[in-house]
Amino acid sequence: MKQLVLIRHGESAWNLENRFTGWADVDLTPKGAEQALAAGEHLRKAGYEFDVAYTSVLRRAIRTLWHVQDAMDLMWLPVVHSWRLNERHYGALTGLNKAETAAQYGDEQVHIWRRSYDIRPPLLEADDERNPKNDSRYAKLNESDIPLGECLKDNVERVLPLWNESIAPALKANKRVLLVAHGNSIRSLIKYLDQMSDEAIMEVNVPNGIPLVYELDDNLKPIQHFYLD
């Protein structure tokens, strides 16, 4: 049996303020830090151990991982940071309050942007200061790989190369994998692992800071999965 544990980062400052966050690099709230420590404590008390961890290049996920590692006494754990695990890029909606956006554009339109599998939000302009190409952490990426806005379908297509090239081989080598990322990058993996339809995955919500345990067979097909809380 192969072990994969997925954790969405703890509450962030913009979760608290009800803002579209995406690739904006906001930090955890004190509550988010507590959620992350609690996740690590749950895993430690349940007897989980890990050989490698994966996370994004955004601080709310990285710091969540640090807290989990600290609670489990696993600060030495090898960590792979990848932009492919970043949150879905919300384009021109980045930083906007969700309620105010709904008041401006209408609830139905915002619901479509948030919950349609293959409809992107309004894209950033190339010269927008929020364009990730202006951020040094993405300097080595091809500009064509840097999104100006994404739907969940784009997010799935971004995450799967990392799964195929790194995470899946690690699992097949019997490494116990911890992955700390974001709501939509985790939903992308859930969709792939559980072979969910485009419609079904849109109804899935991933809570902050609660470990989602996948037990997989030798072909990396789910035997069972459950939240540990």
From Swiss-Prot:
Database matches in SMART domains: PGAM
Keyword Isomerase in record: yes
Record field: catalytic activity: (2R)-2-phosphoglycerate = (2R)-3-phosphoglycerate
Entry annotation: catalytic residues: 9, 87
Keyword terms, alphabetized: Gluconeogenesis, Glycolysis, Isomerase
Keyword set includes tRNA-binding: no
Record-level Gene Ontology MF annotations: phosphoglycerate mutase activity
Subunit structure: Homodimer.
Protein name: 2,3-bisphosphoglycerate-dependent phosphoglycerate mutase
Source organism: Polynucleobacter asymbioticus (strain DSM 18221 / CIP 109841 / QLW-P1DMWA-1)
